[in-house]
Every structure is written in C-alpha cells, then in structure tokens.
Amino acid sequence: MMENVFDYEDIQLIPAKCIVNSRSECDTTVTLGKHKFKLPVVPANMQTIIDERIATYLAENNYFYIMHRFQPEKRISFIRDMQSRGLIASISVGVKEDEYEFVQQLAAEQLTPEYITIDIAHGHSNAVINMIQHIKKHLPESFVIAGNVGTPEAVRELENAGADATKVGIGPGKVCITKIKTGFGTGGWQLAALRWCAKAASKPIIADGGIRTHGDVAKSIRFGATMVMIGSLFAGHEESPGETIERDGKLYKEYFGSASEFQKGEKKNVEGKKMFVEHKGSLEDTLIEMEQDLQSSISYAGGTKLDAIRTVDYVVVKNSIFNGDKVY
C-alpha cells in the first residue's frame, strides 16, 4: 500500500526568488523526441477534443497534438496530408489484430508518422508490449508513446519494450468512470501516481487526466511530467468537434469519454460518460492564456525555463485552494 497519496488540489508549490522583469521573458517550450513545442500541453486524443482541423491548427502553430483513433480508415490520408504540408503527423493506434496490419501497411508505403501513440485503458499488458515491439520493428523512426499506466513497474516494462515515452493516468479524467465501474485507477491520487512513476522513468512521461486548472500543469511538471494531456479544459471551444446546444440561454458543447457508449455506439464495457461543458470561446485564446499562466508559474519558480518548476519546494495542504473559491 502507498502512504501519503495526494492529488492536485492537495499541493501548493512554494515560490523562489524571481529573476525576470516580466513573465514574457519566461520560456514555456518543451522538447519531445526530435521536435520542440510551444507548450508542455497536448489536447486529449478524444473525439470531442480533436479533429483534423484542430490537429492542423496545432501543428501549424508549434503545439503538440495526437490525433484520435476512432476513424482508423482516415489515418493514412491524414499522415500524407500533414506531411505534404511540412507538418508533423501524430496518430493513435490500438492493439487489435488489424492495427498490426495497419503498421505494416505504413511501412510498406514508406509512411512514417513522427509520433505514434498506443492508447488503451490498461496499458500494462502484453498486448501493448507486443505492439511497441511491432512498431519499433517496422517503423523504427517513429517516436512511440505507450499507455496508459499507473505504476512504476508498468513504466519500466513499456520503456524496456522500446517505448520512447509513457502516458500515466488510469481513470482520473472528468468523463472517465473507470474508478466507479471497476474500483481501479489513479483517480483522486493522480499527482502522487505521476510522481511515483516519474521516479522510475528514464524517458519522458505524459501525465494524462485530472487537470482542472492551469496551475495543475505546473504541478505536473514539478512531479516529473514532460508533457501534460488535457481533455475537459480543451472541451467546449468554438472549434471543438461535438454538438453545441443551448440551455437557458447558455451555450454548451458535448464532451464524452473514449470508452463511453456515445463513442462506441454500444453499451458494452462502458467506462466513459457524456457531459455538457460551457462554451468557452476560441481555442487560440485558451492556449495563449495557458502559456501566460505557465510563464507566471516559471517566474514564481525563480527561473526562465520550464525546468525551474521541477526543483521548487511544495507543501501538502488538503484542498487548500478551494476554500470557497470556485475556480471552474
């Protein structure tokens, strides 16, 4: 059993002496594999978060993205399309039999996506290990992200199998009900799980799920994440896929989990739910605000780059921030 678990709202980072005159001097860029990105943040590879249009926008503006895998037949044309424009191609695959054929087809057509994310709910499995090895054999140049996991053993096994990065988080997301349906996961202690996994990792970790505020991005970096995957904060923008509805004069957009019946079209092994999130305006505005908030975080950390956040002190305060303040 693990003692002293904590989650995002239980932690406050402690400021160090500021060395910049303006937060605009702080650099939020991060390198993952061979590419450098503007923010250590990636929108979740979910159907109500990303589509081709958003992927293109993100890639053109130097943000990392991962395309979802729920229209598998479109992936080849997507890779071609992105690469023909000089943009990176970053796709997701599952672990079923036809995904093995898909990887071989890419190799046969000499299509090498820059990033491939193997993305299943319980990533500590032979199925994922075999797929990592398969991709590394046929597409050795692709950067492989594997997940999702929640333990140091899993991180080490996937790294040893050849994963270039691992994705940590089992069920902490807002539209994920894994914790309720199964009793398992990192919901409620995602930040402690991230820290535990990061200590075992020798390659980058992507924290996935449970982010509710921009400050949580800084906290993720502090506890070892290279990149932070975010769903709900990216849901509900003008550009977001998904239907807009009006209720009592307010606009909302649908947001659903990848293992929900809305996603699957059937009620089998459902571990996701649907919710409506308030319409948030433009994606660009949110990305700019995230960058500015992270620049402020770096200045509070007493540095000019993201790495400064990794060494700050912190305190564990149960639910400090929420003493009556509604932040979302």
Curated annotation (Swiss-Prot):
Looking at the record's lineage, which domain of life comes first? Bacteria
User: Which residues take part in binding NADP(+)?
Assistant: 205-228
Cite a GO CC annotation: GMP reductase complex
- CDD domains named in the record: IMPDH
Q: What is its EC number?
A: 1.7.1.7
One GO biological-process annotation of the entry reads: purine nucleotide metabolic process
Identify the enzyme class. oxidoreductase
The signal peptide, as residue positions, is none
Q: Please list the reactions this protein catalyses.
A: IMP + NH4(+) + NADP(+) = GMP + NADPH + 2 H(+)
| PROSITE patterns (alphabetical) | IMP_DH_GMP_RED
For this protein, the record's Pfam families field holds: IMPDH
Which InterPro entries does the record match to this protein?
Aldolase_TIM, Dihydroorotate_DH_CS, GMP_reductase, GuaC_type_2, IMP_DH/GMP_Rdtase_CS, IMP_DH_GMPRt
Which is an annotated GO molecular function term of this record?
A: GMP reductase activity
UniProt feature coiled coil, ranges: none
Keyword line: NADP, Oxidoreductase
Q: Identify which residues the record assigns to the active site.
A: C176 (thioimidate intermediate)
Q: Which family does it belong to?
A: Belongs to the IMPDH/GMPR family. GuaC type 2 subfamily.
**PANTHER family linked to this entry:** GMP REDUCTASE
- Function (record text): Catalyzes the irreversible NADPH-dependent deamination of GMP to IMP. It functions in the conversion of nucleobase, nucleoside and nucleotide derivatives of G to A nucleotides, and in maintaining the intracellular balance of A and G nucleotides.
State the protein's name.
GMP reductase
- What is the native source organism of this protein? Bacillus cereus (strain ATCC 14579 / DSM 31 / CCUG 7414 / JCM 2152 / NBRC 15305 / NCIMB 9373 / NCTC 2599 / NRRL B-3711)
> Gene encoding this polypeptide?
guaC
